[in-house]
UniProtKB/Swiss-Prot annotation:
DNA-binding region: 29-48
Pfam families, alphabetized: TetR_C_26, TetR_N
Domain HTH tetR-type: 6-66
Organism this protein belongs to: Bacillus subtilis (strain 168)
Protein name: Uncharacterized HTH-type transcriptional regulator YvdT
Gene transcribed to yield this protein: yvdT
Keywords on record: DNA-binding, Repressor, Transcription, Transcription regulation
Gene Ontology CC terms: protein-DNA complex
Lineage: Bacteria, Bacillati, Bacillota, Bacilli, Bacillales
Length: 194
């Protein structure tokens, strides 16, 4: 398979996001996607084996964007709680902006029975947060003795689930800032040193 960072790959992926968002996965055709991308149909198959193969790529693209946005707001000297606050804020912002794509990814990955692909896609995000947690443990910002690998996954899942429930499930009995503050407070009480 050609390098995924090529311009054609990105064009096809962005075109797929637009076409699938507009028409839905079932009604979107590969012809529609390549026409929007300005590439030949054969080029599509250099990168993707089928239309369903787009879904993990779209999910990975969105997750990479999320992590890049979080890292882009960091300077490297922030304490754990500042990083967590930024992670929460960016997750909510990206979930609001891309809720249709998130729903598409969930449905597509469920259809393809590829939940194990989620773990592979999430691995860089989990590893990044795990390192942040290990640094926080060393700096006595969080409770010692926690399993940083498990804690990283739990934090990411909790924050994403809450953002998705707010924007996709419309559980909006409070203002979004209340939700973000509650997650932050819950995690600080759970992980903070006394």
């Amino acid at each position: 398979m050609p390098k995924q960072t090529s311009g054609k790959y990105e064009k096809i992926l962005q075109a797929a996001i637009e076409v699938i968002s507009e028409k839905g996965l079932d009604k979107a055709s590969i012809s529609d996607i390549v026409k929007k991308a300005g590439t030949a149909q054969g080029t599509f198959y250099l990168y993707f084996s089928s239309k369903n193969a787009l879904i993990p790529a779209i999910a990975e693209n969105l997750l990479t964007h999320t992590l890049d946005q979080i890292k882009g707001r960091l300077h490297g000297d922030e304490d754990f709680w500042t990083v967590l606050d930024i992670l929460i804020d960016e997750t909510f912002l990206i979930t609001e902006r891309h809720k249709d794509i998130i729903v598409l990814c969930y449905s597509g990955l469920a259809i393809d029975h590829s939940m194990e692909k989620w773990e592979t896609i999430y691995q860089p995000y989990y590893s990044w947060l795990e390192k942040i947690i290990n640094k926080a443990i060393a700096n006595h910002e969080v409770t010692e003795g926690i399993n940083s690998k498990w804690t990283a996954r739990t934090i990411i899942n909790l924050v994403e689930n809450t953002a998705e429930r707010f924007y996709i499930g419309f559980e909006q009995d409070e203002n979004v800032e209340v939700y973000k503050k509650e997650i932050f407070t819950f995690l600080k009480r759970s992980l903070g040193t006394a």
